[in-house]
């Protein structure tokens, strides 16, 4: 028992070291990259050594704790970045454009993934990462679907690439004065189209008005993660039920009942609860900032743990089609969002 706890502790300390390193690199060397992204890159670089590390130090329990428990806690605490009052300032059109983007891009990912004959789970992961909020959304859906880390990693890889492209491309277009948009409209455009919160903050620095609006639009998309996760869970449950009814070879019993049970992502309600608390209780700034930092730490832990568990053979096998899906969704995001902004604002 003591040996197993020691292995668990080694796993947590391992994640802590590389999580703190990710935060340091992000803050000093690469401020344009989220520490979450740096975390998964460090984990991925170390993944070939993970089997031997686990064999010698039995760190699996600590790594699993980081990848699952701390992930969910991080998503719950992520609600501290958002208030309902900020979302309300956008008005109906601001909410609708976020809703159209999230729903449209996610549905497009499902159909385009089928056309490309891509793995269903990867299509969903790339779809939610593009539609909602990049890494955090992919991690939340991974926890709901219980997918293999390699699938999440390949989805994250291409979301990072196109998020960075968008972060560079949109300010370049703004300064070239190509599109007939004012700063407010640019804020809507950037907030509704880019993948990561960090991408939005970086790209929207073109003006104070654009940045304020862009962040609120982005957080509105983040809030829509909750109903989307619940809808996905319910649809998967119904599809599993239908599959079981059509397959007479599947045995009945407790094990089967568990496999076919409706999974409710309770952490999504926790996320929503923190948003509500943050909206109606005037917490001291130190409490809000500490909660936000705790969320970031938990999510970086999860990203390092996820990167460690990458199966590179699977990662490579999913590569080309996943790139194609992420590219098509990026084009849809750019042109679709611009069209909606032009029409609605």
From Swiss-Prot:
Membrane topology: Multi-pass membrane protein
Chief location category: membrane
Keywords: Cell membrane, Membrane, Transmembrane, Transmembrane helix
Compartment annotation: Cell membrane
Residues that span the membrane, as ranges: 7-29, 33-50, 90-112, 122-141, 154-176, 186-208, 215-237, 262-281, 293-312, 322-344
Any matching Pfam family: Cons_hypoth698
Database matches in InterPro entries: UPF0324_pro
GO cellular component: plasma membrane
Superkingdom of the source species: Bacteria
Classification via PANTHER family: INNER MEMBRANE PROTEIN YEIH-RELATED, UPF0324 INNER MEMBRANE PROTEIN YEIH
Annotated family: Belongs to the UPF0324 family.
Protein name: UPF0324 membrane protein HH_1161
Organism field: Helicobacter hepaticus (strain ATCC 51449 / 3B1)
């Amino acid at each position: 028992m003591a040996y197993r706890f020691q292995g668990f502790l080694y796993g947590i300390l391992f994640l802590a070291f590389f999580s703190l390193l990710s935060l340091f690199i992000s803050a000093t060397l690469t401020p344009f990259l989220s520490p979450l992204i740096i975390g998964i890159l460090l984990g991925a670089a170390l993944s070939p050594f993970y089997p031997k590390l686990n064999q010698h130090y039995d760190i699996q329990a600590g790594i699993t704790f980081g990848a699952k428990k701390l992930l969910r806690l991080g998503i719950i605490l992520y609600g501290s970045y958002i208030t309902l009052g900020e979302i309300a300032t956008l008005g109906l059109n601001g909410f609708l454009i976020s809703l159209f983007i999230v729903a449209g891009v996610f549905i497009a990912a499902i159909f385009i993934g089928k056309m490309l004959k891509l793995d269903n789970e990867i299509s969903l992961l790339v779809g939610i990462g593009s539609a909602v909020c990049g890494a955090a959304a992919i991690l939340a859906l991974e926890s709901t679907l219980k997918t293999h880390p390699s699938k999440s990693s390949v989805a994250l890889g291409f979301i990072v690439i196109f998020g960075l492209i968008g972060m560079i491309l949109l300010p370049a277009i703004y300064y070239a004065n190509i599109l007939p948009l004012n700063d407010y409209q640019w804020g809507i455009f950037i907030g509704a189209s880019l993948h990561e919160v960090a991408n939005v903050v970086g790209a929207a620095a073109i003006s104070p008005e654009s940045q304020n609006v862009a962040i609120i639009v982005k957080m509105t998309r983040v809030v829509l993660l909750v109903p989307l996760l619940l809808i996905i869970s319910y649809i998967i449950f119904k599809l599993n039920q239908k599959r079981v009814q059509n397959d007479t070879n599947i045995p009945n019993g407790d094990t089967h009942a568990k496999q076919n049970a409706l999974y409710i992502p309770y952490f999504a309600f926790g996320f929503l609860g923190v948003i509500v608390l943050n909206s109606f209780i005037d917490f001291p700034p130190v409490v809000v900032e500490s909660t936000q930092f705790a969320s970031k730490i938990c999510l970086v832990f999860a990203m390092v743990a996820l990167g460690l568990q990458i199966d590179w053979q699977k990662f490579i096998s999913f590569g080309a089609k996943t790139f194609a899906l992420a590219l098509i969704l990026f084009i849809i995001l750019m042109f679709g969002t611009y069209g909606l902004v032009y029409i609605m604002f």
